[in-house]
Amino acid sequence: MNHCILRINILLFVLIADIDVQAYDRIELAGDVLVVALPVAAAGLTLDFKDGQGTLEFGESAVLAMGMTFALKFAIDKTRPNGGNQSFPSGHATISFSSAEFMCKRYGWEYGFPAYTLATFVAYSRVEAGRHYPIDVLGGTAIGIVGSYLVTRPYKGWNIQPEAGHSYFGIRLNKSW
């Protein structure tokens, strides 16, 4: 699977680096590419692991998170920095962090850490491009993480995850059957 992730990263780099546009547009484009790549990678992991339950859980978590996001978008109808509507919460941040949390909780930090890094870039790109305010992407981030956390269970086998509390930091080792 690591070869698959490497190929995706190389493809994304070539797509982003080969386009002759301003840096501002590249950041937005990179975020737009990654917002598709992250859920594709999450779904791809479930297929690579032959994990039908994981496929179902990823679908449920994505539908839950995006359902909450769209309900809030229509209920709040906040104006975007560029004058558009439905700014809060960011759908890009929601699905990116939903995918990252799914990969982290289901398959462990070795998949979750890179996914969280890319999801953070997606959120940054939305603010940098003038599509959202920081509070919009923070709202989307929270919804995405909570939506996946509530639905996703660790994959059978060993799972290593970082853990932090009020007065400690450590590593949690889980075994699922």
Segment roles from a protein language model:
Residues 37-46:
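Hydrophobic core of alpha-helical transmembrane segments in multi-pass integral membrane proteins
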Residues 45-64:
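Interfacial segments of alpha-helical transmembrane regions
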